[in-house]
Amino acid sequence: MLDEIAATTALHSENVGIRGILEEVAAVTGMGFVAVARVTDTRWIACQVLDQIEFGMSPGDELRVSTTICNDIRESGNAVVIDNVSSDPKWHSHPAPALYGFKSYISLPIILDDGSFYGTLCAIDPEPRKLVGPDTVPTLMRYAERVAAILSREAVSS
């Protein structure tokens, strides 16, 4: 039996609007794994996943939140965009890249209409990607805002 957080997260796992956003993020960034994750102070749960690199994660799967950069986003509320972990002075020593095998990374906070933090729109790839630029975060934040709007509408209708 699913607990309340897992059950609520599972409701979003087949939303076609969210799926379309994941596909757009993958196309725009070249990233092979894109997901919406429900992130709390104790949990990281995959809500919906587009996995083109055989990362091996499915909706409902969980990671230990303390091992994720998404946890840093939950704490700070700031987006993180990394072209190449090995040359990024802030993130090269973080345990997540080695643990999960990625070189490039994106994570954006998903803030619901009521102002609460839901989780993140995140993407990883085993190869470095050119992601950092003046338009990157604003463009990707619009995707996160679209996800937030969908999740907020679903919360109102359920």
Predicted regions and their residues:
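Short loop/turn motifs at secondary-structure junctions and domain boundaries
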Residues: 27-28, 97-102
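A short, aliphatic-rich beta-strand micro-motif
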Residues: 104-112
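Short hydrophobic/aromatic beta-strand element in the GNAT-like acyltransferase core
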Residues: 33, 70, 107, 120
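Regulatory sensory and allosteric helical modules in signal-transduction proteins
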Residues: 39, 43, 55-94, 103
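Intrinsically disordered, low-complexity terminal regulatory regions
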Residues: 1-64, 135, 142-144, 153-158
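Glycine-biased flexible loop/turn sites that connect beta-strands or occur in inter-domain linkers
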Residues: 114-116
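Short beta-strand-to-loop transition segments that serve as allosteric relay/switch motifs
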Residues: 121-130
